[in-house]
UniProtKB/Swiss-Prot annotation:
Swiss-Prot/TrEMBL keywords: Heme, Iron, Membrane, Metal-binding, Monooxygenase, Oxidoreductase
PANTHER family on file: CYTOCHROME P450 82A2, CYTOCHROME P450 82C3-RELATED
GO cellular component entries: membrane
Organism name: Glycine max (Soybean)
Protein name, UniProt field: Cytochrome P450 82A4
Any matching Pfam family: p450
Location(s), subcellular: Membrane
Top-level division of the source organism's lineage: Eukaryota
Enzyme Commission designation: 1.14.-.-
């Protein structure tokens, strides 16, 4: 009997195994033939439970890791982010299909910890679900806060902050210059000052930072915004594997809650100050800061059940985080690329011709500085603020590139891979601003040309592109116009990237500076 049972068990196992192998043999090729036209290829090597998260978390440059996969698997492929599938787009034509034909389908955002815990429970425009609330809030931001006329009204704020920083650097040079008539300066810290002050003054009417003085509240504010940006760029296990969220691997959830509370207290104080001033009749006429504009538009209102205070605070945080980090990182990468390519500095002649050495840069000069604009475009091509797009989610089943994509699949656009496509860009890894004056002169960065998407495209395109470009152009042009710059070292510049929500330079940027304008210019600023 035992022999029979043993025979039956062995036979059963053998038969089942044989059937399984036969199915694999027959069905496998069939699936490959018929399935390839339906779903994009899936990258192998996924870990149990975690999927391909170790690939992204373990890489200092996830955009380059995904770019290498595109070389192997093509412009469309799928990876697993824990329990979630993500479609990676690495080709401008596929991006065009995404943000035109399928734009509505890909305008949703996935539910993420950072959006819940640090973005006022998804109230911030950048993370808000696509729908009536998002449309109404975006309309207010585009037409009333970041409109051309509103930004133009605050031109004096931008110019004065840049000029203040130039004068402060001139004073630093006078006190610290060496025997060669140069002074050393760390540019990441120096550019952070005018950009942060500029954005804060336009948003809430405050000026915090100075090269010669420190302020406890200012340091606290900058630190909190920096921490927000750091946490916004992390991959959390809870996002990929929701049932493991309670473990809070890395302590990110705790840190997000603490940072959110710190920022909310700060912005709430600003909001209360504005209400008190308005009650006294102050700050309601002339060129108002953005918080006053929002109080005029939103106070006492709700949108889709979200109260005015939450709308205002979330929008203030949106503009501060988007308007500072991206601008600073773009300017720093531009300076790195200029220093690495000394011939570029020779084109400072454009500044001398268009502006001269006896006056300061004005915003009206920027339109004539075509080479400077080309430098900024080329910088955004090589070092986009976000080399991987903010994640989106397919809100419905659709077809992309001939492949079927299921609802709920996440979308990642590899901006860096598109920007370095050799089929579009000759010498794609070389810094060649002249291409935007010749072969690619008609391509802009505003989302209309899918070969160059530093600020996204479609309905979710960044609403503050013009605002950001004005800031970058003015600050960069003013610095290059006012000072000669040198690399203090004979060693190659460290171009290591620190990947997060914004792609920043990992190490400081030390340069030598010397004034190159008439001394009267610095005195008149």
């Amino acid at each position: 009997m035992e022999l029979v049972l043993h025979f039956l068990n062995t036979t059963t196992i053998g038969v089942v195994s044989l059937i399984f192998l036969l199915c694999l043999f027959l069905y496998g090729p069939l699936k490959k033939v018929h399935g390839s036209s339906k779903e994009a290829p899936t990258v192998g090597g996924a870990w149990p439970i975690f999927g391909h998260l170790p690939l992204l978390i373990g890489s200092k440059s996830p955009h380059k890791a995904l770019g290498a996969l595109a070389e192997k698997h093509g412009p469309l492929f799928t990876i697993k982010l824990g329990a979630k599938k993500a479609l990676v787009v690495s080709d401008w034509e596929m991006a065009r299909e995404c943000f035109t034909t399928n734009d509505v389908a890909v305008s949703a955002r996935p539910k993420l910890l950072v959006a819940e815990l640090m973005c006022y429970n998804n109230a911030m425009l950048l993370v808000a679900p696509y729908g009536p609330y998002w449309r109404e809030l975006r309309k207010i931001i585009v037409t009333e806060i970041l409109s051309s006329s509103r930004v133009e009204q605050l031109q004096d704020v931008r110019v004065s902050e840049v000029q203040n920083s130039i004068v402060e650097l001139y004073d630093v040079w006078r006190s610290q210059k060496n025997e060669s008539d140069y002074a050393s300066v760390e540019l990441k810290q120096w550019f952070a000052q005018p950009i942060f002050n500029m954005v804060l003054r336009m948003v809430v009417g405050k000026r915090f930072l100075s090269a010669t003085a420190t302020d406890e509240k200012a340091e606290k504010c900058v630190k909190a915004v920096d921490e927000f940006m750091r946490l916004a760029g992390v991959f959390t296990v809870g996002d990929a594997i929701p049932y493991l969220r309670w473990l809070d691997f890395g302590g990110y959830e705790k840190a997000m809650k603490e940072t959110a509370k710190e920022l909310d207290v700060m912005i709430s104080e600003w909001l209360e100050e504005h209400r008190q001033k308005r009650a006294l009749g102050e700050g309601v006429d002339g060129a108002q800061d953005f918080m006053n504009v929002m109080l005029s538009s939103l106070d006492g209102k709700t949108i889709d059940g979200i109260d005015a205070d939450t709308l205002i605070k979330s929008t203030v945080l949106t503009i501060i985080q988007a308007g500072t980090e991206a601008s600073i990182s773009t300017i720093i990468w531009a300076m790195c690329l200029i220093l690495k390519n000394p011939l570029i500095l020779e084109n400072k002649a454009e500044l001398d011709i268009q502006v001269g050495k006896d006056r300061c840069i004005c915003e009206s000069d920027i339109s004539n500085l075509v080479y400077l604009q080309a430098v900024v475009k080329e910088t955004l091509r090589l070092y986009a603020p976000g080399p991987l797009s903010s994640p989106r989610e397919f809100a419905e089943d659709c077809t992309l590139g001939g492949y079927h994509v299921k609802k709920g699949t996440r979308l990642i656009t590899n901006i860096w891979k598109i920007h370095t496509d050799p089929n579009v860009w000759s010498d794609p890894f070389e810094f060649k601003p002249d291409r935007f004056l010749t072969t690619h002169k008609d391509i802009d960065v505003k989302g209309h040309h899918f070969q160059l998407l530093p600020f996204g495209s479609g309905r979710r395109v960044c609403p503050g592109i013009s605002f950001g470009l004005q800031t970058v152009h003015l600050a960069l042009a003013s610095f290059l116009h006012s000072f000669e710059i040198l690399n203090p070292s004979t060693e190659p510049l460290d171009m290591t990237e620190a990947f997060g929500v914004t792609n920043t330079k990992a190490t400081p940027l030390e340069v030598l500076v010397k004034p190159c304008l008439s001394p009267s210019c610095y005195k008149s600023m």
